[in-house]
């Protein structure tokens, strides 16, 4: 980000309260390079309800229950230009969007729907959330430390969706359309329907996102080789892309009797992507790539009145792609056609039991078994003759079949100790087996909730977790990006990372939230860049660090000015430490303190007609990732929201990243490593229209994990 933009950005932030509602779309970038076909692959990188305290003239937006905070999310977003579940979650205190994903208090967070954990990857789950209308949300439960009975470890957000109530027939629906311009045009159409008849209810959802993309990347590198030579490389990369994504969901519930239910949910996704890239400068390259992704996910759940829950889930994912590459770099020449595919079959079965006992005791236990088979290949061909090419230093043909099995057995209890103190504790034992790893681990979880006075809540949590690597990251393969100078290397020896965290949260007057935490991650894994000392290539590869540590403080403070301004400010300060003693030939031990500021303001311009202006913003100071340095970044967004037809129709005009300061240009200046990537940044303007029809007679409904797919 150019420094001349920092001052006006900060002035705007301080003069008009802001927030971090960053718009997520196909142009979001993260510091990884997992796919050879993205627009810019280098940047992929108990049970006791506590009393509420009413603030004069306001309803509480949050109430505390043992181990979790329950937010009135529809109220939080009622005046915001939010039209889908993903953007709605970004309005929760402490939730930010970083690198195209959601974080809670600076840490990764798992999102589930209706209390059901899915086998969808993170990317597939986010796509599903973006297709779910915000009007379908009933509430959000935030857990900084999820008990084992949720079959999730670490931070968790549970989104409960509205359903029709039992009784007479009812139906309702929503139509949505959006047009945006971010250098090139983009479109979205969405339709949803909710139906109920006696004991049966169903929901249907379809969305279509499509458009064109444009990106520019300027690279500057000083590449040092072991022979003492230094090579100056400067390139200009221009990419043009187009894509279509179709998402569909069908969910059904049959209520056999009270608390006796059979449910089935199907989620599907089909997408196509086409990219053309031209590179000039020290390297001259032309790259064309295409991909098609199919995902099918089905889940069956059965719940009984005596606390028994059972279920099964199947996920099928298939992602074939191809790439045609012609590249010249000094005396090196690359000419080949690559065809690759990842096909995943994953099954999950679970059985869980909960008991409500006397004297405030609760008992829960269960087992979860997950198995997957990854069939992947990557082959190289001569682009002229179509003949297969044999493996060499530059070409690595690969075909693999990898099976993974996980068995998790857990038990836990809850106890109310009077009116002010409650406790929830559990222990999970897990066996993880692959062709490389065969290990047992245990994961303790403890939550304490103390209410010294009405409206004042103190929560303390101790948790442990494991983060599994992506399937494609552990393949023994080499892929090319950036015209050939950049290579992506798989790492078959990549191991899961293990995380341990202690966190304290204090809620004042049921709306002011303060948190402090410490987190230690052993074998932390992230994709990093390394300029090879043996040849003129830069290598992107997932590696296990010795550890990563974080300590942080967070404050979330909402405030209002009469009836015309509703605001919230969230501040975070984080100490960040990463260490790796065997990082190639340049071990590192790096520390950094950085801050994050989010602010959100809604100005009521008029009540008749209903017209509101939303101004949001985000600032993130300098940070690190491995040997990367990440510059200061931030954005300012504005949206004008007009509600008509008694709230059934909403028109939203918006402009995101007004100052074009949201995209960072990461750089490396560490020992022999010297490289900078300047990425293009464009403001986005758009308009959306939402129309609701039918009538809601509300009841209560969850999503899948695809984070590790290619």
Where is each model-derived feature located?
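N-terminal periplasmic accessory domains that precede
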Residues: 85-88, 125-127, 152-176, 187-189
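Short acidic/polar hinge/loop motifs at secondary-structure boundaries
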Residues: 118-145
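Transmembrane beta-barrel wall of Gram-negative outer-membrane proteins
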Residues: 184-212, 228-275, 296, 304-305, ...
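Transmembrane beta-strands of outer-membrane beta-barrel pores
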Residues: 177-183, 197, 208-212, 268-272, ...
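Outer-membrane beta-barrel signature, preferentially recognizing the C-terminal barrel domain
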Residues: 466-516, 520, 540-552, 560, ...
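Short, acidic, small-residue-rich periplasmic hinge/interaction motif at the N-terminus
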Residues: 22-77, 97-99, 106-108, 141, ...
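Conserved C-terminal beta-signal and adjacent last beta-strands/turns
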Residues: 591-710
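Face-selective signature of the C-terminal outer-membrane beta-barrel domain
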Residues: 245-271, 287-444, 449-455, 510-516, ...
